[in-house]
Amino acid sequence: MKILAINPGSTSTKIAVYEDTTPLLVRNIRHSVGELSHFPRVIDQFEFRKNLVIEALKENGIPFEFDAIVGRGGLLKPIPGGVYEVNDAMLDDIAHAMRSHACNLGCLIAAELAALLPGCRAFIADPGVVDELDEIARITGSPLMPRITIWHALNQRAIARRYAAELTTASPDLSLIHI
């Protein structure tokens, strides 16, 4: 399976191409403040970043042939952790997102690029809005201010899985504190 992964961040767009588990390309495309200042809103960077991904693939001789394209999950409505296929409801949620961040571009770019390839599907994994809090963790000093979870779920879950693999333990069997 050939996969393109796209991770838009505040000042860069990271991409990687994998054939199964073998990396074929890992690239960090940096964006200067000057480049990004031309865009009034983060969402306006969509075409710019999408085109940079396509250019990077061409420059590195990677044919535009993928089975799946994975974008960094955006600031959607809260959902449990996992891998999700990009759908119309998700795209609409991002279009009307309460918060603006470059990560919102991930599923948009993945969906648009996947639509160009027959049989290719677009996904996100463990977006920053993963919400698996126990009810007691939602308690704040005021019922008027409910706790909202926004965290780097993708990174922290990956580190937990890596650590569990080093211990030859399944990560659900571990009790870890993410800081």
Give residue ranges: language-model regions.
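Short, well-ordered amphipathic alpha-helical segments that serve as non-catalytic structural scaffolds
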Residues: 48-60, 159
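A structural micro-motif
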Residues: 1, 64, 119-120
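Conserved small/polar residues in nucleotide/adenosyl-binding loops
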Residues: 177-179
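Short glycine-rich, Thr/Ser-proximal phosphate-binding strand/loop in the N-terminal lobe
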Residues: 3-44
